[in-house]
Amino acid sequence: MAGAKEIRTQIKSIKNTQKITKAMEMVAASKMRKAQDRMLATRPYAEKIRQVIGHVAMAKAEYKHPYLEEREVKRVGMIIISTDRGLCGGLNINLFKKAVLAMREWHDKGVEVDLCLVGNKALGFFKRLGGNVVGKVNQLGDQPRMNDLIGTIKVMLDAYDEGRIDRLVLVENEFVNTMTQKPRATTLLPLVPSEEDELKHHWDYIYEPDAKPVLDTLLTRYIESVVYQGVVENVACEMAARMVAMKSASDNAGDLIKELQLVYNKARQAAITQEISEIVSGAAAV
């Protein structure tokens, strides 16, 4: 058994760590509420543009935009949104598992995958994995801006326009609630409506002055908005996961302190008993 002094030092060290985790928990809780507000503020625009794009995808326009046409998949582009920092539980690991599983499925079909990475954690992980990284952006902070993402998104859109990739997939975290964040993979390009949507569709758009410039701008804005929404939502996921992880760490530290306090009391009691025994033995010898 360790001595009372060593145990006391351990208890002090754990208490200091507990103070840090509690502070991080409170900071994450505060930032999470702000991140949720930003996420909710961006959703109406994202949902509306998704609705418009859904209608456009079903329209029978004379000009068929390349983003609306499905083609044989020889190479896939994948945008993966992670965090810049750790200490957020299994948020990034679960996301990477989802991405790696999707990559393996494509590789099994003989399809190569190009990666565009958002966040330091994804960059570090997929570089170690040996992934083909063609674009990256990090250090977006707790209040990401669209302008910081446009250059990275353009790399993938240019690759799609030039035929270097035939499908664009977004891998992100979905904010379900404070306790639950789920990784998901969504196909961004091509935009192909389902058969059910086509059966419900009974109208069309008239484009002025011309369909091409309207669709070029609208579809690009759509992709940018979806990726930006994913980044904003990922910040909320990060803060929620960090808050839960730090609360768990604080609770575990409290349990460990209680256990060490019990061990300390036993060690102190044993030392006192030994001292009394030595005093009694000495008195008897005299």
UniProtKB/Swiss-Prot annotation:
Q: Could you provide one GO biological process annotation from this protein's UniProt record?
A: proton motive force-driven plasma membrane ATP synthesis
User: What are the subcellular locations of this protein?
Assistant: Cell inner membrane
Matching entries from InterPro entries are given as: ATP_synth_F1_ATPase_gsu, ATP_synth_F1_gsu, ATP_synth_F1_gsu_CS
List keywords of the entry alphabetically: ATP synthesis, Cell inner membrane, Cell membrane, CF(1), Hydrogen ion transport, Ion transport, Membrane, Transport
**Top-level taxon of the source organism:** Bacteria
Name a GO molecular-function annotation.
proton-transporting ATP synthase activity, rotational mechanism
Primary subcellular site in the record, as a coarse category: membrane
Pfam families annotated for this entry? ATP-synt
Topology relative to the membrane: Peripheral membrane protein
GO terms under cellular component = plasma membrane; proton-transporting ATP synthase complex
Oligomer status and interactors: F-type ATPases have 2 components, CF(1) - the catalytic core - and CF(0) - the membrane proton channel. CF(1) has five subunits: alpha(3), beta(3), gamma(1), delta(1), epsilon(1). CF(0) has three main subunits: a, b and c.
Family the UniProt entry places it in: Belongs to the ATPase gamma chain family.
Functionally, this protein is described as follows: Produces ATP from ADP in the presence of a proton gradient across the membrane. The gamma chain is believed to be important in regulating ATPase activity and the flow of protons through the CF(0) complex.
Q: What is this protein called?
A: ATP synthase gamma chain
Record the organism: Thioalkalivibrio sulfidiphilus (strain HL-EbGR7)
